[in-house]
Amino acid sequence: MKRREQSQTEQLRQALSEREAQLQEAQARLAALEGSTSLQVGRALTAAAKRPGRGLVRLPRDLFRLWRKSGTTRQSAGGRRKPQPVRSYDAERQEARLLAGNIGNRDDRLVVAGVLSPEVHAAIEPYVRVIALRPQDAQVVFESVDVDAVLVSASAAATGSLWAHVGDPSSGDRTRALHWVVEAAASRGVPSILLNDAPAPPALTTLPFSLVHDGGVGVPLHRFNPIAAEPERRVDPVHLPSVGNSGVVANRLVDMLVRDGDLRRADPGWAEEPATLRAATTVVVDDPALADRAMACGARALLLGGAPDGDTADTGRTPDRVPVDASALSSGAAAEGLARVRAAGPLSSEELRLVLRSVFLTDATPVRLADILGRVDFAPGSGSPSASLRIRQVSVTAVPTDDITSLAFADDILKQEYAPAEIVLPDGVDHLAGVARLRSAGIPMRTVRGVDTNADAGGAPGPAAWAALAREATSPWVALWRAPRGAAFLTDVLCAAECSGADAVGPAVPWWGSGASASADGDGRASALDDAVADQDYVFVSAIEPDLARTELVRRGLQPGVWNRHGARLLALGPQPDTDREAEPGQVGSTPDAG
């Protein structure tokens, strides 16, 4: 009750200050208007019109006096100080926003005022609009912007950052600045969230946050991914330290492995960490979150300590674990586990697909943000907590021609691990059995008139048909369905797009100009280049058969063979072998078979 009264008082105080500013502006404008010559001339003319007898006689005299007064004012104006222009209240607020550095194009993302470490800032930047708060101007910036939430990471209190040691008695000014931000947010009805992603001074958790989340922001797949990883990785295992305290036993195990020559240490900065993981075959860590990031980059992880997680036992994300206790120092379990993981090599393509699917669906940064923001109450008129997931929405387009094709399409869509936002079909297919089945399942559906359903030479719809369907799609992505691809079809292509930032994803095909170039040069260099990437996934290529593309790109109606000439980034991702076969529990993982 006390916080609610404080919130209402703060809102009334802010409204009163705004009204006073507007009143002062109106009074200044009124005074300037009453003192203007134009108004006095108008009054003289009005008085003369009301009393024509006397008014017309006095009008020349009154106008002459105004003229003399105006001339005297202009002559003496040079020796007097010019009056300051009347400043608008809206102009004052726009100037404050400009000085705060927060002028920019608005978008559909949530607006978050952040006290964040550089790593957390880079992780959430693609999914929310971050307005960074600094200790020296936190109050000015926060008062000049409208935000949906306040997000504070404990890692921002690390040494060397702007908010270093916030919450510590030695940094009372920074703690007071952050406390003011949290209380001001509460007075507006804006939730404030603390991410306990690193050890922090205890006073930080005592601030009146709306929510304290134990953990980080998940795995940012746009940073930790296997995109363009070299086929040949370093074979020597590498140890990456965690942010928190590893423990005495874990540190001694690492020291023993390094002393025996089985392990090398690496301590890259947060910016170089993804490249280090992509270049490694085996990674030794003591943090489960770091193990997930290593496996998302294609490396095999050995986790020191931690209890098995039953939720990830069947997803390929169960790394080999070594218990961290006193017996591990004398049993040699760490060396044996490292030898097994090292012998297994990096993750296979099937294992990597399973890992990326699991991370994409459960622990990627947009999923974690939606979960965290969904646990607080937003102020009326704010954005949706699930706004970070909008960039994943996909519209599935297809051109079924008969009942057999439509039933195959319906079966493929209904078993997808990641449900589409909508389905876009040409008009006149409502009578097909598969379309009726999709409607009965409650999937949103759109139909488009005038779609050319004639197939091209390869038996698939042409670019004009896909473009007509994409023009009616409302999602940022369009999936082009041609044949059944399995339950993980949408998950795989959307995950690849999120990892790479590509404009289109699909199997690599020979570039349309490679044959001509080869015949002209006589050396087949272009054809050799196509063959080099034909069997590789998660690499950028010259041409693909698109399975997923940005809606704006498909709407242009271009042949996919020339998309790269128009600036599109094309990522190769072939179909997963045995897509319809369900993985057996424990079949794929980071622990090799004992036999």
Regions from the PLM with identified roles:
Residues 411-420:
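Short, acidic, metal-binding catalytic loop of nucleotide-sugar glycosyltransferases
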Residues 176-261, 336, 340-344, 352, ...:
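Catalytic core of nucleotide-activated saccharide and alditol-phosphate transferases
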Residues 205, 257-260, 264-362, 366, ...:
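Catalytic binding pocket for nucleotide-activated donors in carbohydrate/polymer assembly enzymes
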Residues 84-141, 213-297, 307-308, 313:
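Nucleotide-sugar donor-binding catalytic core of glycosyltransferases
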Residues 467-490:
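Short beta-strand-to-loop acidic/aromatic patch adjacent to the donor-nucleotide binding site
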